[in-house]
Amino acid sequence: MSEATAATAAIGKCWSVYLVRAENGALYCGISDDPLRRFDTHCSGKGARFFHSSPARALVYVEACASKGDALRRERAIKALSKRAKERLLVGVPVLREVGEPAI
């Protein structure tokens, strides 16, 4: 095991809460230890059923959390917000990745 891998294992996974914009403009909120990979999964049609009616189009927000529990609590708080309040979270935040863009 490399030093970097050992350090990551000692610290634990970094969890994030993320928002994905669907083709119809709706926002989907979820958590993941790898939001870019999860976005790619949503785009491939193998992610949440939410995207069956309107495909994922852009990863628009990612917020790092200290633990999985913190990410779950933040996800619940964001899901409780109105659409308008969720849109306010995105003001000034650049789109992180759109469908078809290569992984960095």
Swiss-Prot record:
Transmembrane segments: none annotated. PROSITE patterns: GIY_YIG (PS50164). It holds the Pfam family GIY-YIG. Residues 13-88 form the GIY-YIG domain. It comes from the Bacteria. InterPro entries: GIY-YIG_endonuc, GIY-YIG_endonuc_sf, UPF0213_domain. Gene3D superfamilies: GIY-YIG endonuclease (3.40.1440.10). Belongs to the UPF0213 family. This is UPF0213 protein PA3854.
